[in-house]
Amino acid sequence: MEMQDQSKINLGIVVSEFNYDITSLMLQRALSHAEFLGVTVKVVVKVPGSYDMAVIVKELLKRDEIDGVVTLGAVIKGETKHDEIVATQTARKLMDLSVEYGKPVTLGIIGHGVTHEQAVERIEEYSMRAVESAVKLIKRLKKLREIDLTKETNVSIE
């Protein structure tokens, strides 16, 4: 994604402390990429685990000064299916909140079903993609909300 003036875009980041050897690096990459893109990260909130994100994300989405939320986490496969439950339920609730508030909540959560080594390999990709997706969605939602579709046709928003 090319660097543009995105100074009017304000993000919140919610990051899991579980697997913090991975998520701390994800946070560093996300903050660097947001700076590169010229967007403002208004707040970073750490939560115990990915499953705990929804309540904080909801509070951020209520705030007028937050345009979107980036979530960062790593759900590593264990001996049970716990990772599947955590990842699936977290993703579902985050999507529900995004739709409810009409603001992007991007999924920078690695997993389920990944090993620690696989998660490490995905740190940069997931972090940067989550920030880029938030920025793109915020810009496109803004354009969509400004268009008077009673007067315009064949509109393409990119």
From Swiss-Prot:
Q: Which UniProt keywords apply?
A: Riboflavin biosynthesis, Transferase
Pathway entry: Cofactor biosynthesis; riboflavin biosynthesis; riboflavin from 2-hydroxy-3-oxobutyl phosphate and 5-amino-6-(D-ribitylamino)uracil: step 1/2
Q: Which Pfam families match?
A: DMRL_synthase
Describe the reaction catalysed, as an equation: (2S)-2-hydroxy-3-oxobutyl phosphate + 5-amino-6-(D-ribitylamino)uracil = 6,7-dimethyl-8-(1-D-ribityl)lumazine + phosphate + 2 H2O + H(+)
Chain segments annotated as coiled-coil in the UniProt record? none
> Where does the record place the catalytic residues?
H82 (proton donor)
Q: Where does (2S)-2-hydroxy-3-oxobutyl phosphate bind?
A: E79, T80, R122
In the record, biological process GO terms are: riboflavin biosynthetic process
Question: What EC number(s) are associated with this protein in UniProt?
Answer: 2.5.1.78
Q: Any idea which GO molecular function terms this record carries?
A: 6,7-dimethyl-8-ribityllumazine synthase activity
**HAMAP family noted in UniProt:** Lumazine_synth
Role of this protein = Catalyzes the formation of 6,7-dimethyl-8-ribityllumazine by condensation of 5-amino-6-(D-ribitylamino)uracil with 3,4-dihydroxy-2-butanone 4-phosphate. This is the penultimate step in the biosynthesis of riboflavin.
Similarity section: Belongs to the DMRL synthase family.
According to UniProt, the name of this protein is 6,7-dimethyl-8-ribityllumazine synthase
Q: Which organism is it from?
A: Sulfolobus acidocaldarius (strain ATCC 33909 / DSM 639 / JCM 8929 / NBRC 15157 / NCIMB 11770)
